[in-house]
Amino acid sequence: MATVAAIGGQTADDSFGRDRLVILASSLGTIFEWYDFFVYGTLAALLGRLFFPTANPTAGLLLSLATFGAGFGVRPLGALLFGVIGDRVGRKYTFLATITLMGISTAAVGLLPTFSNAGLWAPGLLVALRLVQGLALGGEYGGAAIYVAEHAPSGKRGFYTSFIQASVVGGFLLSLVVTLLTVFALGKPAFDAWGWRVPFVVSLLLLALSLYIRLKLHESPVFKAMKAAGKVCEHPARESFGSLRNWGPILVALFGISAGLTVIWYTAQFSTLYFLQQTALVDDTHAKLLSGTAALLSAPFFVFFGWLSDKIGRKPLMVSGYGLTLLLLFPLFHGLAGAANPALARAAAAAPITVAGVDCRFNPFDKQQATACGQAMQFLSGRGIGFHRLRSFGLPLRIKIGSKIAVDLGDVHGKFDKALVEQALIRAGYPTTSDRVERSDLGIVLTVLAMGILSAMTYGPVAAILVELFPARIRYTSMSVPYHIGTGYFGGFLPLISQYIIAKTGDPYGGLWYTFAVVAVALFVTVVGLPETRHRDIAA
């Protein structure tokens, strides 16, 4: 593509313009993907009430999130399906199909009847649409990454493909703007009644723009040359997964690349936001605006590290990004706590909380815990307050705040008393919200930005790495499946796993151990198994 001959006599200016169109068309798919992801995630609680009505709001939310997760579950299947099509039919037509399915299934959510109108048909249709979208998404990223990389000059693959990763931020910011503007324009009651449909239907505009641009493009030069030479693979799945030689790169792509970079990205975007909202007690709107600001500032770093990988190599950046994440993960979150809610940080240091009881069974998914000790843990977890759990062979429940006993079960006649504990927490200096005057919004943005930069170090070069790991004839299939297993399972379930660990242990930083463990494995696999790929001929 870098030569005039390769582009059919086009001038250098024509080639440059075409390159920009290729990058834009591919990046729009990523914006689309993450726009839907953030919109649905933000509205999960509301959709739970509308489509899964139940006496237990927690159960409704979990069913809504399970429906959301169903899309992740089928992404590897979509990766296999569209990967085979992309390797046999071509890159362009495959990712035209995936963007169309994505757009229709996303917009259709905004047209669905709710449970009150259609009964069980409503959640059934919602699940069906999420499955269709999950299948389409399984083929979208691989197609976009390959299409850009196969157009890029050999010395600029990291730079060109990095725009796909940077556009994830675009999806987040677009969802934030559309949702907040809709709420502002309609008011909260109208938004909850029917306005929630607007962000989904608006995605039709993204679909129209994406199709308009993609229809202007031609097939990738690598695939055209391969087709002209009669080297198109007839059985991509069999050749990808039936060859022992190809299993090494697949496992490296899964455990060394996709799993590691995904949990860092989810931690940078989601865990920081949840931490601000649930632990640091920053109000929802400000938490999103501060996170959005940090995300916007981090976007250029994805492009920078993609460009840098063209200069120094892919592997050094991956190893450095993983290593720095292991070193800085916990310090950054402790710093975030101090910036977002200094009063809470002071109280936690001066008056740590212990919960002791004979029976401290605690299931974070139950609306009401069976024992007083479990109820105490549920209350503290809901308040975002950390605690240490001890086993007691005496009283059914004892809560200590610092050196003072706040509650002995006998003091409250055998029942857990929220009001009594709340009063004790306030006396010990535990705040009920983040003080906007005392907190440092700049400190919050800089800390979240630091996590975003760590994510950019590993996410920026990823598309180039995955494309370069596999031969052209089976590239779409071979890279898409491990990528979506990594992003869908290791990353997609990170919020659930992390929040479960936090609630179960009482440690507001406990969920970070999941990220730490996955990144540690990814670092080992990358050091041992990832070759340097930047000089490979991807036409081979």
What is the role of each PLM region?
Residues 40-41, 246-295, 333, 358-390, ...:
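Extracytoplasmic gate region of multi-pass secondary transporters
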Residues 88-100, 311-322:
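Cytoplasmic membrane-interface "Motif A"-like loop-to-helix N-cap segments
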Residues 44-77:
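Extracellular/periplasmic helix-loop-helix junction of adjacent transmembrane segments
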Residues 65-84, 103-105, 170, 292-305:
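Central cavity-lining transmembrane alpha-helices of secondary-active solute carriers
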Residues 112, 118-138, 343-356, 438-457:
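Hydrophobic core of transmembrane alpha-helices in multi-pass small-molecule transporters
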Residues 53, 100-119, 323-346, 427-436:
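C-terminal ends and interior cores of transmembrane alpha-helices
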Residues 334-446:
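Low-complexity, proline/glycine-enriched hydrophobic segments characteristic of transmembrane helices
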Residues 136, 158-183, 206, 332, ...:
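Glycine-rich segments within core transmembrane alpha-helices of 12-TM secondary carriers
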